[in-house]
């Protein structure tokens, strides 16, 4: 395959003419197709995607569109490839790029801000004021892999150098896909929440962000760390990741338990990852005066909040989206130092051609799936084993709402 003259490649990592990629058609419909391999421009690299984890937001995009925004509108029937929690190997360097080398393993952040708006200048590029306003011109405005540009359910993707995080060979592919998840928790706990060692933290909801929130909080010296949820097996994973106390809210009142654990003083910080309708009110009552609540979940029902209680007790309430202020780099540092084992939340692995099954496992929590990872490392085997006209590979696949 010929490449633009200023794109640096390496014979040790040859590029084929096309790649396999899942593209979104109508809502809930994905097709595995051949697409041209994109070429990196200035300040960009081409990454061969080795593994991609499935996030609940991917499921929302596939079925409902938002928060993806392609060409100024919904992402359906635009040959758009979703997926945003991925890692891989650098396969090509755009003009002038010398920060990375071909063959280097990297984890990839989602967001590359415009770099010009107020929020980007503050380092809050996940809150870029130009999000989605590039309308297909990736040289302008905010770029978000799997949201406003093609993402990771493919063999290759182009990424801005500011979104790359170098990872050591000691970190597995699956673990590297979790850097962004841990970075999201890190962003909420430290950059926005100001968590310092010795402060007490509760995490509500043992999903991926919640479980890694426990791990990050403990690694940063929080004490005590309390995890609440409804599934005992997930609570035990949380304990293994550093929770000092776990509370099953089906059998115990979480607020009363926290008050008992803290001798009535309350905690300093709550990371709310459950999305339950009463979670914010419960979080407020777990805190001492001046405590902070970080909202990291998307409730599917209206939420009732006792604002007067929050005002009287000087409680701070804020939301996070993604992994701003380079928090993912700090999360990767903790993971590289083996301060916690993020792979405890990795439960299932599928091949790229099995993406619809992987999505179903993630959506329906089959076999208590927590983090489902899709790998491209067996793609060549799949190509050899499946005829080119096999509809399971090239045809439309309806991703059922289950």
Predicted features and spans:
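Glycine-rich cofactor phosphate-binding loops and adjacent beta1-alpha1 units
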Residues: 192-197, 220, 236-316, 356, ...
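Mid-domain Rossmann-like dinucleotide-binding core that forms the NAD(H)/NADP(H) cofactor-binding site
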Residues: 162-164, 168-252, 256
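NAD(P)H dinucleotide-binding glycine-rich loop of Rossmann-like/cofactor-binding domains
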Residues: 37, 73-77, 84, 114-204, ...
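Rossmann-fold dehydrogenase core element
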Residues: 292-294, 305-344
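Glycine-rich beta-strand-centered segment in the early N-terminal region that forms part
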Residues: 38-52, 67-121, 126, 168-170
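C-terminal hydrophobic helical "lid"/dimerization subdomain
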Residues: 2-17, 277, 281-285, 326-402
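Short N-terminal strand-loop motif that marks the start
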Residues: 1-87, 151, 155, 159, ...
């Amino acid at each position: 395959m010929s490449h633009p003259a200023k794109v640096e490649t390496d014979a040790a990592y040859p590029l084929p003419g096309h790649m396999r990629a899942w593209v979104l058609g109508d809502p809930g419909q994905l097709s595995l197709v051949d697409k041209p391999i994109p070429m990196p421009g200035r300040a960009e690299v081409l990454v061969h995607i080795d593994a991609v984890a499935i996030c609940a937001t991917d499921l929302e995009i596939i079925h409902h569109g938002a928060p993806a925004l392609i060409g100024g509108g919904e992402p359906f029937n635009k040959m758009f490839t979703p997926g945003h929690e991925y890692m891989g190997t650098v396969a090509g360097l755009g003009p002038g790029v010398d920060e990375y080398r071909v063959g280097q393993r990297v984890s990839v952040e989602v967001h590359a801000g415009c770099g010009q708006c107020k929020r980007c200048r503050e380092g809050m590029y996940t809150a870029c004021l130009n999000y989605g306003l590039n309308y297909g011109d990736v040289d302008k405005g905010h770029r978000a892999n799997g949201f406003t540009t093609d993402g990771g359910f493919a063999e290759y993707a182009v990424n801005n150098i500011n979104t790359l995080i170098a990872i050591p060979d000691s970190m597995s592919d699956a673990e590297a896909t979790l850097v962004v998840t841990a970075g999201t928790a890190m962003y909420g706990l430290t950059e926005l929440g100001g968590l310092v060692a010795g402060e007490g933290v509760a995490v509500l909801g043992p999903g991926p962000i919640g479980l890694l929130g426990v791990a990050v909080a403990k690694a940063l010296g929080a004490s005590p760390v309390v995890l609440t949820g409804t599934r005992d097996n997930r609570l035990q994973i949380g304990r293994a990741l550093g929770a000092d106390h776990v509370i099953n809210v089906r059998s115990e009142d979480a607020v009363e338990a926290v008050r008992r654990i803290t001798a009535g003083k309350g905690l300093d910080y709550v990371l709310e990852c459950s999305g339950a309708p009463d979670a914010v009110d419960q979080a407020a009552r777990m805190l001492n005066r001046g405590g902070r609540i970080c909202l990291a979940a998307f409730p599917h029902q209206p939420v009732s909040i006792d604002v007067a209680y929050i005002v009287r007790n000087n409680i701070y309430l804020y939301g996070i989206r993604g992994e701003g202020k380079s928090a993912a780099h700090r999360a990767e540092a903790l993971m590289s130092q083996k301060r916690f084992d993020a792979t405890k939340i990795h439960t299932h692995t599928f091949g790229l051609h099995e993406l619809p099954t992987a999505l179903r496992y993630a959506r329906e929590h089959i076999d208590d799936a927590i983090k489902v990872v899709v790998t491209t490392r067996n793609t060549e085997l799949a190509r050899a084993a499946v005829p080119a006209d096999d509809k399971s590979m090239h045809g439309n696949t309806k991703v059922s709402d289950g």
